[in-house]
Amino acid sequence: MRLKSFSLILPCLFGVMFSQIANAQSGENTYKQVCAACHGTGVLNAPKFGDKAKWAPLIAEGQATLTAHAYFGVRGMPPKGGNPNLSIEGFSDAVVYIVNNSGGNWKTPDAKMTAAINKELEVRKAGTKKP
């Protein structure tokens, strides 16, 4: 019975693990294709990838706030990083990738975090909150 239970759980564990790996690769790819042009070089004072000192105050804003504000456009950054076709999911994966390589330790957004990001986006769209 234990072996049968284990054989049922094992695929789920691998599915979660591979999903996280795929999200990390997706975040890295989005970073390279969209974000690196500015965050790789520091253009227009964009915090450079890996610069822990520059990223620390942004990371301190929290995952939902930073992701939503950046997706909406903030501090000279264009909405969606300048790619009008970039989904919030793809953008969120890229933010996690950047943050985790710049001093943070964020997880790929789950349903609860995605809801918090979307709620913060709605607040930004309504113009009731300024960064």
Model regions and ranges:
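Bacterial N-terminal signal peptides that target proteins for export
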Residues: 1-10
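Sec/Tat signal peptide C-region and signal peptidase I cleavage site
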Residues: 17-24
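Axial heme c-ligation environment in periplasmic c-type cytochrome domains
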Residues: 69-93, 98-121
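Bacterial N-terminal signal peptides
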Residues: 9-17
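Gly/Gly-Pro-rich "capping" loops immediately C-terminal to redox-active cysteine motifs
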Residues: 40-69, 78-81
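The canonical Cys-X-X-Cys-His
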Residues: 31-41, 94, 98
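Short, solvent-exposed mixed-charge patches
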Residues: 129-131
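Sequence context surrounding c-type heme c attachment/ligation sites in exported
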Residues: 25-36, 56-68, 85, 107-108
